[in-house]
């Protein structure tokens, strides 16, 4: 009966890593280039929870690139006035990344976390909205692009003021406390309970 301890370990590991325990992080990928009309208009909003990731994919080209030249950017986190004017100036403008290699695949990731051990990391507060803009480099054909990141959840009753698309598109599907846990979590709990009642574990 050496398989029973192994079965117990596998079940508990699956349970502890499941969304019911908050062990599942979501990733939202944004292709940061001027072919994205929502980034151009400034109405792109992403809702993420703590421990989720925002992945920014820089513009990249196969071959010579567009006739007007490749897009290259410096991406900043700014306050609301900087977002509205698309200006990365002042003490509340933080340079986050530089997309300067248009002929190679470059991707940056921002972990949405309350506390960070890194000196250059950023700490996010639930219920707050953060603003990202990109400023084209002088030789770039790019334009100002803007994105809002809303960090869930200050209060469970408050809803997002902006649509974020379908759950698969926005990267916000998954269990957030208060909603129904996933069927996998319920199945694992039921299996653990049955095995415990049968005194197998």
Swiss-Prot record:
GO terms for molecular function: ephrin receptor binding; transmembrane-ephrin receptor activity. Expressed in the adult spleen, lymph node, prostate, ovary, small intestine, and colon, and in fetal heart, lung, liver and kidney. Also detected in hematopoietic cell lines. Glycans are attached at residue 33. Keywords: Cell membrane, Disulfide bond, Glycoprotein, GPI-anchor, Lipoprotein, Membrane, Secreted, Signal. Residues 1-25 form the signal peptide. GO terms for cellular component: extracellular region; plasma membrane; side of membrane. Disulfide bonds join 58-99, 86-144. The gene is EFNA4. Residues 171-201 form a propeptide. PROSITE patterns: EPHRIN_RBD_1, EPHRIN_RBD_2. Belongs to the ephrin family. The keyword Protease does not apply. Cell surface GPI-bound ligand for Eph receptors, a family of receptor tyrosine kinases which are crucial for migration, repulsion and adhesion during neuronal, vascular and epithelial development. Binds promiscuously Eph receptors residing on adjacent cells, leading to contact-dependent bidirectional signaling into neighboring cells. May play a role in the interaction between activated B-lymphocytes and dendritic cells in tonsils. One of its GO terms (biological process) is ephrin receptor signaling pathway. Residues 26-155 form the Ephrin RBD domain. PANTHER family: EPHRIN, EPHRIN-A4. A lipid is attached at residue 170 (GPI-anchor amidated serine). This is Ephrin-A4.
């Amino acid at each position: 009966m050496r398989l029973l301890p192994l079965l117990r370990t596998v079940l508990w590991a699956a349970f502890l890593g499941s969304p019911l325990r908050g062990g599942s992080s979501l990733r939202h990928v944004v292709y940061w280039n001027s072919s994205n009309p929502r980034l151009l208009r400034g109405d792109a909003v992403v809702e993420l929870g703590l421990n989720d990731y925002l992945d920014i994919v820089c513009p990249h080209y196969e071959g010579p690139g567009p006739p007007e030249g490749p897009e290259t950017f410096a991406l900043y986190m700014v306050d609301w006035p900087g977002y509205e004017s698309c200006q990365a100036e002042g003490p509340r403008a933080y340079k986050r990344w530089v997309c300067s290699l248009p002929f190679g695949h470059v991707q940056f990731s921002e972990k949405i976390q309350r506390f960070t051990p890194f000196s250059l990391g950023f700490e996010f507060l639930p219920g707050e909205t953060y603003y990202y803009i990109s400023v084209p480099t002088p030789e770039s054909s790019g334009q100002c692009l803007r994105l809002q990141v809303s960090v869930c959840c200050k209060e469970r009753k408050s809803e997002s003021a902006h649509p974020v698309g379908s759950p698969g598109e926005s990267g916000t599907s998954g269990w957030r406390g208060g909603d129904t846990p996933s069927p996998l979590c319920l199945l694992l709990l039921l299996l653990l309970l049955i095995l415990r009642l049968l005194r197998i574990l």
